[in-house]
């Protein structure tokens, strides 16, 4: 009898063992959510950077967001900061320093660099991240963010040795779970800056292992882990040890796989979406949605795909930008001539079909964190434009190349062509348009081979300072945002005052003065503010996009439409 019982017990345990091994990854979600599946979408531009401090565009940010997480995030609906990788923070009474408490139970992705060592997120990782963002390292494009804020950051940036053994003296590790930032100014805007996707936390151990090849080995704490990057795109896989859960208690994320696809020549992104090979469209003019998708009743009858549109009053500003350091645009009169020759209302009315808002007051949109305090007349004035042109040193016949990264035939491309024709006709500028990919255009700009180009900017954190810092000449480092080489001591002085003020109304007024100076000196010609439109296949639930253009798929799941 005992032998029979023993044999049965062993047999039962073997069955349970095999069953457990086969079913261990099967997860059942509450609240109608579903685990598993693969979601994908096409990127509007190919991303070359999967490292937070190297990103130079919204497309790069979207590629890093699944892997890397920020210390804080911004809740747009509540208009407040939300703890992320830190669970608490506090300022000293005099705002001289900021203490951060690291969230417990957060681990970096499994990677060979941690062999035999803990993957737990520590304060030393956060210090290393912030030190890196203040360094001269070739991978760092973000020195402008923290060097004006933290004591010792500028000195560290000036150190050509790029030695991380000590780092920034104003960033102090107090324990494994806490650190202190000693601050230059008292405005508390550093909290908003810490929501910046380019300050997402990286692993100190990963950098010690991979060094300058760290961008090929992205290791973060986010909902997805890096699988591979190829000519096809970037593949991410579910992080089984992710720390967050949703409101139902479901362990996130739901998706097994996420893919950001790179478009090949001849591929139709819209066809891929309508055939459900991809799950969202990240760039589509809102005026074309009805013509492309038809009506809701059509979709229910199977004539087209059921979809959901997220339309955000975006904070993206589109503008013309000049290299103010070299001819011909080191001549402010030529810049002013173009500033007054552009009809912003025409662009929005005739080419953007009423979508977007003319940027007639300046570079900043009117948003919760910035309000214009004065009215400005429509800057379009051909008589004034011609007056400035006569004062300029421009010689008729001199060729000016206008670099754009537009898709031929798109509304944006059409207004760019119209602008070239109009400036030729009204100001007799010998202007020529050249189309380049985004990365090609950026390479030309950063190498000094472009003098005028079409550009766009999305605020990376919810503060007016974000829009204005690229024109602050004390803003040190190799940031790609400083393309115009604009220098104004008057602008810098007012920015210094704005950065030191706590009172919101006074601070807002200083920022208005900064906008006035930009309108007068014209390093850029603000054109229009663009709304962000993302179209989701209705089977993809829980996906979100914010006004800063970052896609959040941490709570996204696939659910068949019945």
Show where each model-derived region lies.
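Gly/Pro-rich hinge or "lid" segments in bacterial periplasmic/extracellular proteins
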Residues: 76, 157, 162-178, 182-252, ...
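Ligand/substrate-recognition segments at binding pockets and active sites
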Residues: 231, 390-459, 532
């Amino acid at each position: 009898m005992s032998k029979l019982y023993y044999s049965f017990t062993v047999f039962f345990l073997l069955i349970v063992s095999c069953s457990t091994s086969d079913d261990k990854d099967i997860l059942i979600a509450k609240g109608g959510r579903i685990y598993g599946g693969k979601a994908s979408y096409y990127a509007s531009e190919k991303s070359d950077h999967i490292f937070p401090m190297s990103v130079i565009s919204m497309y790069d940010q979207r590629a890093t967001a699944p892997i890397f997480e920020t210390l804080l995030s911004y809740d747009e609906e509540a208009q407040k900061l939300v703890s992320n990788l830190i669970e608490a923070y506090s300022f000293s009474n005099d705002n001289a320093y900021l203490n951060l408490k690291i969230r417990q139970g957060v681990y970096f992705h499994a990677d060979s660099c941690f062999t035999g060592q803990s993957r737990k997120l520590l304060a030393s990782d956060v210090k290393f991240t912030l030190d890196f963002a203040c360094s001269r390292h070739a991978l760092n494009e973000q020195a402008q963010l923290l060097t004006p804020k933290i004591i010792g950051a500028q000195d560290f940036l000036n150190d050509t040795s790029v030695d991380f053994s000590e780092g920034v003296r104003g960033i102090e590790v107090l324990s494994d779970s806490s650190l202190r930032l000693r601050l230059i100014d008292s405005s508390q805007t550093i909290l908003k800056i810490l929501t910046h996707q380019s300050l997402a936390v990286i692993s100190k151990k990963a950098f010690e292992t991979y060094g300058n090849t760290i961008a090929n080995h992205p290791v973060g704490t986010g909902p997805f882990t890096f699988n591979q990057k190829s000519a096809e795109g970037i593949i991410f896989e579910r992080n089984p040890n992710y720390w967050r859960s949703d409101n139902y208690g479901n362990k996130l994320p739901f998706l097994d796989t996420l893919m950001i696809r790179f478009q090949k020549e001849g591929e139709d992104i819209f066809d891929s979406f309508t055939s459900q090979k991809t799950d969202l469209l990240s760039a589509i003019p809102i005026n074309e949605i009805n013509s492309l998708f038809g009506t809701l009743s059509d979709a229910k009858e199977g004539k087209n795909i059921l979809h959901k549109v997220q339309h955000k009053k975006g904070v993206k500003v589109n503008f013309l930008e000049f290299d103010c350091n070299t001819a011909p645009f080191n001549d402010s009169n030529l810049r002013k001539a173009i500033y007054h020759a552009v009809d912003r209302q025409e662009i929005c009315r005739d080419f953007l079909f009423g979508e977007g808002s003319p940027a007639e007051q300046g570079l900043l949109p009117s948003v919760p964190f910035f309000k214009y305090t004065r009215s400005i007349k429509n800057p379009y004035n051909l008589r004034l434009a011609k007056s400035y042109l006569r004062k300029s040193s421009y010689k008729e016949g001199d060729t000016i190349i206008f670099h754009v990264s537009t898709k031929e035939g798109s509304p944006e491309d059409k207004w760019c062509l119209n602008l070239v024709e109009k400036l030729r006709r009204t100001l007799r500028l010998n202007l020529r348009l050249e189309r380049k990919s985004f990365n090609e255009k950026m390479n030309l700009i950063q190498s000094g081979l472009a003098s005028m180009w079409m550009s766009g900017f999305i605020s990376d954190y919810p503060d007016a300072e974000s829009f204005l810092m690229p024109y602050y000449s004390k803003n040190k480092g190799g940031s790609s945002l400083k393309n115009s080489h604009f220098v104004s001591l008057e602008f810098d002085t007012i920015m210094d005052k704005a950065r030191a003020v706590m009172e919101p109304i006074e601070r807002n007024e200083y920022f208005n003065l900064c906008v006035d100076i930009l309108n007068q000196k014209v390093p850029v010609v603000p054109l229009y503010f663009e709304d962000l439109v993302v179209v989701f296949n209705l089977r993809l639930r829980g996906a979100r996009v914010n006004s800063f253009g970052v896609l959040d798929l941490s709570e996204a799941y696939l659910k068949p439409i019945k």
